[in-house]
Amino acid sequence: TPKTLYWSPQYLSIAKFIGDSIILPATLKNDSIATCQLGEIAIENKGNGHTQGKVLFRPEQFSLAKKIQDPTASFKGEIKRIESRGRAINICIDICGYELNINEDLINEYHTDEQVTMYLYGKGVFYND
């Protein structure tokens, strides 16, 4: 289905082709957890028995807003840049040395150098390629 193709493609190369992605080197801890630059992350394992690989996220999995559903993980970060995009803003946040760019609605006011909590919703997908 299109949903599966976007959220859980069989191969990382397909994931890169179909939309924006965040890809980080990762080490498989067990069948459902990988460790990457952001820390330990719940994953769907498509590593085919490998323990070294990459974990894929979609940018929309990250948010500064706490939603109705419980987040899978949360991270402390610092806002590095803010770019206005009409009714939304693009925010660059440094989390453990990784600069993550997300789009947020203009509901809240954010400032450069502000310490924030970033929430991850859903799992990453672990690949060996």
Show the residue positions of the predicted features.
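Internal alpha/beta loop-helix hairpins
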Residues: 1-41
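Non-catalytic connector elements of ABC transporters
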Residues: 21-23, 31-129
